[in-house]
Curated annotation (Swiss-Prot):
GO cellular component labels: protein-DNA complex
Stated name of the protein: LexA repressor
Similarity annotation: Belongs to the peptidase S24 family.
Gene: lexA
Gene3D superfamilies linked: Umud Fragment, subunit A, Winged helix-like DNA-binding domain superfamily/Winged helix DNA-binding domain
Annotated GO MF terms: sequence-specific DNA binding; serine-type endopeptidase activity
Length: 231
């Protein structure tokens, strides 16, 4: 697991030094939204404002985080913050608290798209903060793009707490007719819906008595490349 660095401004560095033109435009959209609405934009709103695809906007936002221009709180809506740049300070190394890291097994793949056959196969592990990975947890690698508006992209890993029950609006991993999928859960008196976070996909409606089982609730999302693989 690589250490993360928080980059702060070096002496004489201009506010946009180190940004690409695309990243400068994204920063301007963020500033405008905060000035206008008092809230930062979502990645989807950034993409719409600049005529970009959501995955492309997400990639550039992540690069701005790595460069230290913004920070984000994982799995929190509208969590983008602009980092105030200090011209006196050098880059500061941030190391994880190793004592708090726990291994979470990666046991296979889950569909963010058409459900795929649920086959458990231990393919590696993620190191997670024990404050996040509470209880019996596992991870699955995401296939498909049905959850991109929730910032879950193909190749990412979802960290899931094993539980049979979940609340309306939770993002869950469900087994439907023997196949696994990650979707947002909505329950009514008549039906259960597994809703995608991508307008290109339709909700999966499960009638009363349908063959569905909640495998767990998604606690966190880790980008591809975060795993220690057995392969």
């Amino acid at each position: 697991m690589t250490d993360r660095k928080e980059h702060k401004m070096k002496p004489g560095r201009r506010p946009t030094e180190g940004m690409t033109p695309s990243q400068e435009r994204i920063m301007q959209v963020i500033r405008n939204a905060i000035d206008r609405d008092g809230l930062p934009p979502t990645v989807k709103e950034i993409a719409e404002a600049l005529g970009m695809k959501t995955p492309s906007a997400h990639e550039q936002v992540q690069k701005l985080v790595k460069k230290g221009f913004i920070r984000r709180t994982p799995r929190k809506a509208r969590s983008i913050e602009i980092v105030e740049q200090s011209p006196e300070e050098e880059p500061v190394e941030k190391k994880p608290d190793v004592a708090r890291l726990v291994p979470v097994p990666i046991i296979g793949e889950v569909a963010a798209g058409i459900p795929i056959l649920a086959v458990e196969n231990h393919i590696g592990e993620l190191l997670m903060d024990s404050r996040t990975a509470r209880g019996p947890c596992f991870a699955l690698k995401v296939k498909g793009d049905s959850m991109i508006d929730a910032e879950i992209f193909e190749g990412d890993y979802v960290v899931v707490r094993h539980q049979a029950l979940a609340e309306n609006g939770d993002i869950v991993v469900a087994i439907l007719d023997g196949e696994a999928t990650v979707k947002r859960l909505y329950i009514s008196e008549e039906t259960i819906e597994l809703r995608p976070e991508n307008r290109s996909y339709q909700p999966i409606v499960v009638p009363p008595g349908g063959d569905i089982r909640i495998l767990g609730k998604v606690l966190a999302v880790r980008g591809h490349g975060a795993a220690n693989n057995n392969e």
